[in-house]
């Protein structure tokens, strides 16, 4: 097989065993840098798949949705499923021999963990964010990282609408009071949202969906984005963040975690907001300066806030997790009036998690079986058409290498004994990725080609799919 750490076998024996039926568990295998695709007579396209897919080991952490587990098991992979995240020390041991890992937001794939990942070729983040992964080092190791940028957009947008109504009516405080036995029926400081202005910072997949929902509720929508983006409905793009803060009754953040967005809402920005306005953050925990938020709440500058994400978050559920030892300002924040706090539940709906499971597991499968890197967040995006039934003696070369001059010439010289049916190469920073389909392949020529590719000084990772 092509996966590092797989069992070695005789290439010719493995090729001779190709048939329309799945191989039995005692079949010989290709060398540990080769994969064999099954053939299906009812389909014109040939799907590249491991000859012995049960040798591909996948680790799923953090209770990834069952849709992903089912998809990956249907491919014949060996899948280990855990409901919790793992500490760095535990993961350093657990990740050895693993070819693909699936995580959510709690597991940290640090440089130390990735250095221990001796067989890893791909990472699936079953969420939007990827800041829990050392993306640059993963790319240096030839490890592609995929996420789910679209599947939970509706769930987050709906939650924000709920926040807007709850903040305007002080629902959070009234609920807490009644839980304590206190009856406090008041209208002071409670508002309808119709006719108010929602300011959206970041008009991407979530921000634009929120825009549509908000207008349906009677809100006026303005937005700020670093890129010019065509509005949906009657929304209006503003030219600066201060202008948005000055005009909006509700400010909702939908930006990624980056050095540019760290503490982008701090004391200066709170001072620019309207008196009695509201802040909502369901994006990333580093975006809002929480001590500045506490000050703005206590001073009455803002009338309330809803926070779903935090700079530091617990690794798992349970009591006494959201405490000052996690974030020094926790106690102050929890005592502020009309502050809704939720435990990072923006994408936590059955629909979102199901769709995320499907989206990411399919991306993992495409990369493992075909080398398709479209949608990777840290990696050159390359895809070739599927091989057909007519391509009986074709192989697919997947070559990750350093982005230096002369590599394509060196690789194409190694293809001298083969016909190049199709080829595509792309680069991203210091990493480049070449995918080529070659014909006139024999077991011996593939073995020799693999050895030559591995010997190139620019090589990061080599796989051959057959």
Curated annotation (Swiss-Prot):
Q: Which SUPFAM superfamilies match?
A: ACT-like (SSF55021), Formate/glycerate dehydrogenase catalytic domain-like (SSF52283), NAD(P)-binding Rossmann-fold domains (SSF51735)
Taken from the record, one Pfam family name reads 2-Hacid_dh_C
Q: Which residues are recorded as modified (Phosphoserine)?
A: 87, 258
What are the recorded Gene Ontology BP terms?
Answer: L-serine biosynthetic process
The record's GO CC annotations read:
cytosol
Please state the pathway this protein functions in, per its UniProt record.
Amino-acid biosynthesis; L-serine biosynthesis; L-serine from 3-phospho-D-glycerate: step 1/3
Skewed-composition ranges (Polar residues): 16-26
Report the EC code(s) recorded for this entry: 1.1.1.95, 1.1.1.399
| Alphabetically ordered keywords of this record | Amino-acid biosynthesis, NAD, Oxidoreductase, Phosphoprotein, Serine biosynthesis
Specify which residues bind NAD(+) according to the UniProt entry for this protein: 205-206, 225, 282-284, 308, 344-347
Q: What segment(s) does the record annotate as region Disordered?
A: 1-26
Reactions that this protein is recorded to catalyse: (2R)-3-phosphoglycerate + NAD(+) = 3-phosphooxypyruvate + NADH + H(+); (R)-2-hydroxyglutarate + NAD(+) = 2-oxoglutarate + NADH + H(+)
The chain positions of domain ACT read: 396-466
Q: Which GO terms describe its molecular function?
A: NAD binding; phosphoglycerate dehydrogenase activity
Q: Which residues catalyse the reaction?
A: 284, 313, 344
Q: Where is the composition biased (Basic and acidic residues)?
A: 1-15
Q: Which NCBIfam families match?
A: PRK11790.1 (NF008759)
Task performed by this protein? Catalyzes the reversible oxidation of 3-phospho-D-glycerate to 3-phosphonooxypyruvate, the first step of the phosphorylated L-serine biosynthesis pathway. Also catalyzes the reversible oxidation of 2-hydroxyglutarate to 2-oxoglutarate.
Q: Which family does it belong to?
A: Belongs to the D-isomer specific 2-hydroxyacid dehydrogenase family.
Provide the protein name: Putative D-3-phosphoglycerate dehydrogenase
Q: Which organism is it from?
A: Schizosaccharomyces pombe (strain 972 / ATCC 24843)
């Amino acid at each position: 097989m092509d996966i590092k750490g797989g069992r070695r076998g005789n290439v010719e024996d493995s090729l001779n065993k190709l048939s329309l039926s799945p191989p039995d568990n005692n079949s010989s295998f290709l060398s540990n840098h080769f994969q064999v695709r099954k053939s299906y007579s009812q389909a014109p396209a040939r799907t590249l798949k491991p000859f012995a897919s049960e040798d591909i080991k996948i680790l799923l952490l953090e209770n990834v949705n069952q849709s992903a587990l089912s998809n990956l098991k249907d491919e014949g992979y060996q899948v280990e499923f855990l409901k919790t995240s793992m500490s760095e020390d535990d993961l350093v041991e657990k990740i050895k021999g693993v070819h693909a890992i699936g995580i959510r937001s709690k597991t940290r794939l640090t440089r130390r963990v990735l250095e221990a990942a001796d067989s890893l070729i791909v990472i699936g983040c079953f969420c939007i964010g990827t800041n829990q992964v050392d993306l640059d080092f993963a790319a240096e190791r030839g490890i592609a990282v995929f996420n789910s940028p679209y599947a939970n957009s509706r769930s987050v947008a709906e939650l924000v609408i709920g926040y807007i109504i709850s903040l305007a009516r002080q629902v959070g405080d009234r609920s807490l009071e009644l839980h304590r036995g206190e009856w406090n029926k008041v209208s002071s400081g409670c508002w309808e949202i119709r006719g108010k202005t929602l300011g959206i910072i970041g008009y991407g997949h979530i921000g634009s969906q929120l825009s549509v929902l908000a207008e349906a509720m009677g809100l006026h929508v303005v937005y700020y984005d670093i890129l010019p983006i065509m509005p949906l409905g009657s929304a209006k793009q503003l030219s600066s963040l201060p202008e948005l803060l000055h005009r909006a009754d509700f400010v909702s953040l939908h930006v990624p975690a980056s050095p540019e967005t760290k503490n982008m809402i701090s004391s200066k920005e709170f001072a620019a907001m309207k008196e009695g306005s509201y802040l909502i953050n369901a994006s990333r925990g580093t975006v809002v300066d929480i001590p500045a938020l506490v000050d703005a709440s206590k001073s009455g500058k803002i009338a309330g806030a809803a926070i779903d994400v935090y700079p530091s978050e617990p690794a798992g559920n349970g009591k006494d997790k959201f405490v000052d030892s996690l974030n020094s300002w926790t106690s102050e924040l929890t005592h502020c009036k009309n502050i809704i706090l939720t435990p990072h539940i923006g994408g936590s709906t059955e629909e979102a998690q199901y769709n995320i499971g499907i989206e990411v597991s399919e991306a993992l499968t495409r990369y493992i079986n075909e080398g398709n890197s479209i949608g990777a967040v840290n990696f050159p995006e390359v895809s070739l058409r599927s091989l057909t039934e007519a391509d009986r003696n074709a192989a697919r070369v997947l070559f990750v290498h350093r982005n230096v001059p002369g590599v394509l010439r060196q690789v194409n010289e190694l293809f001298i004994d083969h016909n190049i049916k199709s080829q595509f190469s792309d680069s991203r920073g210091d990493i480049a990725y070449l995918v080529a389909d070659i014909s006139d392949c024999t077991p011996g020529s593939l073995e020799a080609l693999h050895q030559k590719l591995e010997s190139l000084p620019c090589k990061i990772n080599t796989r051959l799919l057959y």
